[in-house]
Amino acid sequence: MESSAGPMELVAALLRGLTPRAEQLLQLSSGGGEAAAGGAAEARAAVATVAAALLGCAFLVLWRRVSAGRKRKREEAERSAAAVAGVGKGGKNASAAAGEEAGGADGRKRVTVFFGTQTGTAEGFAKALAEEAKSRYDKAIFKVVDLDEYAMEDEEYEERLKKEKISLFFVATYGDGEPTDNAARFYKWFTEGNERGVWLNDFQYAIFGLGNRQYEHFNKVAKVVDELLVEQGGKRLVPVGLGDDDQCIEDDFNAWKETLWPELDQLLRDENDVSTGTTYTAAIPEYRVEFVKPDEAAHLERNFSLANGYAVHDAQHPCRANVAVRRELHTPASDRSCTHLEFDIAGTGLTYETGDHVGVYTENCLEVVEEAERLLGYSPEAFFTIHADKEDGTPLGGGSLAPPFPSPITVRNALARYADLLNSPKKSALVALATYASDSTEADRLRFLASPAGKDEYAQWVVASQRSLLEVMAEFPSAKPPLGVFFAAVAPRLQPRYYSISSSPSMAPTRIHVTCALVHEKTPAGRVHKGVCSTWIKNAIPSEETKDCSWAPVFVRQSNFKLPADPSVPVIMIGPGTGLAPFRGFLQERLSQKQSGAELGRSVFFFGCRNSKMDFIYEDELNTFLEEGALSELVLAFSREGPTKEYVQHKMSQKASEIWDMISQGGYIYVCGDAKGMARDVHRVLHTIVQEQGSLDSSKAESFVKSLQTEGRYLRDVW
C-alpha cells in the first residue's frame, strides 16, 4: 500500500505544476495590452493559490504536531496504566479497560485509581497503592490514570465514569484552592455540571487529598469532589484523607490507606477467601542505568537547546528562552535582593496574556551539585543512560516509575537539572538510603526515622529543622545508593518554579518579565538555604552584556487572574513586595488601553514594603502610571519607617468607605502575595469592610464575599 503524500510533498507538487505556467504568465504580463493584463491577473491568482496552499499546509503541520503530542501523551498514560494493571502484550489497553463494566468476561473486578498532581506526589501515592493492592487482591485489576488523560474531550468524562464501579482519587490542592494542572479540566467539568442529578448509583469511591494546613483552602479540591460525588449518587467507602504537607504527608497517606483495606477486602475478596495475606514490603524503585564512554555519548546527549520545536509548550515541553535583561530592584542600602529579569521569547512561538504565570526550570548551583557528587561517590563527567524498562522492554517497578529524564547525560548535569537536593527527604527516601548503607548502625538509624516509632523524631530532626536531603546524607555517609535508586527513590525530580508574569504583551510582546525576591535564609539546623531558582535568577547573565548569556527552559501557564473585560469597571489591587508583579502587567495593559482611546474606570493599588529608600520596587514606573492615568491612586504602607508597623491591610481599613463604593459599583478586587499571612489578613479586613460598610451581619458578609469570589470579582494569586 502506498503511503499518502505529506503536506510538504503536496506543496512541492503544486509548485511543480504551476511553475511552467507561471513563467508563461510572467512573459505575457511583461508585454502590453489585454494579454498582459490577463496574464498578470492569472499570475496573481496562481500566487494566491500557492499562498493559500502554503498557509493550509502550515495549519496542517501544526494540527498534526498538536494531535501527535496529545496521542503520544495518551499512549504513554495507557502504557503506564496497562503495566500497573498487569496487561501485557496483546492485552487491552487502559482506555479500552476504562470503558468496560466491572466484572468483565475474565471475571476480574476493576478499580480505577485517578490522580491529579503538580509535583508528582499524588501520582506516586496512586501508583504505590496500586502496587500494594495488586499483591493483596490477585483477582482484581488496578488501573492508574491521569485525570487529564482519562477523557480526551469533556463529554467523555460522564460516559466513562458511568461505567466505573470502584474508583480511588488522589487529588492535590494547589495555589488558592485550585486543582492541579492535570486535574483542572476534570474539576471544571465536574463542578460546573449542576444539572446532572443522581447518576452515579453504582459508583463506590475513596479520596485522598494532598494539601497544606497553613493555607486557607486546605484540601479544598478533595473536599469539593467528595461532596459532589455524594450528591450525585456515589457511595463513599472511607472518610476523605486530608494529607498535610506541612507535617508528614506520608504518615497521613499510610493512616488513610489502613482504613481503606477493610473496605476493599469486602469488595474484592471472594467469600471463601479467608487469607489474611502477608505483610507487604514495597520494593525500592530503581531505574536501569548504563554507563557509556564519553566518545559514544557526546553526540547523543540531549538537552533543552532542542526544545523549541514543539507546537505547544507546557511543563513537559518547555521552550528555551535567553535572558535579555537583569537588574537589581533594591537600592544598595537594602540587605536583601530582588531581581527584575526578562526572558526573550521572540521567534519561539511562546505567547502569554496579562496575568499568566511563567514556569521556569533552572539548575542547582555548582556548590550544591559538587556536594552531591562527593556524597554519592561518582565522577561528575561520567556519562550514563537511564531507563524505566528492562533490556527486553518490560517495565520496571510494575510500570510505576515516572518516565526518566533525557539521556545520555553526565552525572553533573543530571544532578544539576533533575534532582531536588535541598528539600527535606521523605520517609521512603530514608528507607532507600538505609538499604544501601554499609554501616549497620546508620542503616538502623535511618529505618527508625522512617518507622512509626520514629515519627516524632523525624518530625523534629528532619521536618522542623528543615534538613535537606544532602544534609541527611552527610549524617549517614555510608549510604551510597546506585544512581538508578538515587533518581527513582531518593531525590525527587526538580520541579519548575512559577512566577506571576510582571509584564503585558501589549507593551512587551516578545519578552516575559519576572520579578523575583532572593531566597537566602538560615534554617533551624544552621544551614544557609539559597533558593534554587531565585539564586539562578540573581546570577543570570543577560544578552545585553554578552552573547554567551544565560538561558532557561520556560513555559506559560494560563491563569484566571485577569482584568475585567470592560476597562471602565473599577479595580482594586493589593500586592505588597513582589506581589506587585502581576499588577505591573495590569497597569501596562491599562496604559495601552488608555492610549488606544478606552475610558478607564477608577483603579487603586495598595502596595507595601519595608522602607521607601530600600525596597520600593518599580517606584518610578508606578509614578508614571499615575501621571499617565493608568492608575488613579497609589496607597503606600511602609512597615519599617515609622514607630509602628503599617501593612496594606491597615491602609485598607483606612480606605474602607472608598473600597465599599468601588465594590458597590461592580468593582473587582485582586490580591497577590503571601497566602499564609498577608492574604489571610486582607481577607479578614475585606470581610470587616463589607460587614460594616454594608450594614450586614457576619454570616451575610461572609456570603457576600463568597459571592464576589463565585462571580470572579475577587481573585487571588497567592503562594
UniProtKB/Swiss-Prot annotation:
Residues at which NADP(+) binds: R336, T578, S639, R640, K645, E646, Y647, V648, Q649, D681
Residues bound to FMN: 117-122, 172-175, 210-219, 245
Locations listed in the record: Endoplasmic reticulum membrane
Keyword Transmembrane attributed: yes
SUPFAM superfamilies given in the database record: Ferredoxin reductase-like, C-terminal NADP-linked domain, Flavoproteins, Riboflavin synthase domain-like
Enzymatic reactions: 2 oxidized [cytochrome P450] + NADPH = 2 reduced [cytochrome P450] + NADP(+) + H(+)
Residue ranges occupied by any FAD-binding FR-type domain in the UniProt entry: 316-564
Residues spanning the membrane: 43-63
Cytoplasmic side: 64-719
One Pfam family matching this protein: NAD_binding_1
Lumenal side: 1-42
Topology of this chain in the membrane: Single-pass membrane protein
GO molecular function terms listed in the Swiss-Prot or TrEMBL record: flavin adenine dinucleotide binding; FMN binding; NADP binding; NADPH-hemoprotein reductase activity
Chief location category: endoplasmic reticulum
Cellular component GO terms held in the UniProt record: cytosol; endoplasmic reticulum membrane
Alphabetic keyword roster: Endoplasmic reticulum, FAD, Flavoprotein, FMN, Membrane, NADP, Oxidoreductase, Transmembrane, Transmembrane helix
Annotated positions binding FAD: R497, Y498, Y499, S500, T515, C516, A517, G531, V532, C533, S534, W719
Similarity section: Belongs to the NADPH--cytochrome P450 reductase family.
Alphabetized PANTHER family for the sequence: NADPH--CYTOCHROME P450 REDUCTASE 2 (PTHR19384:SF126), NITRIC OXIDE SYNTHASE-RELATED (PTHR19384)
Known role: This enzyme is required for electron transfer from NADP to cytochrome P450 in microsomes. It can also provide electron transfer to heme oxygenase and cytochrome B5. Can reduce cytochrome c in vitro.
Name assigned to this protein: NADPH--cytochrome P450 reductase 2
UniProt organism field: Oryza sativa subsp. japonica (Rice)
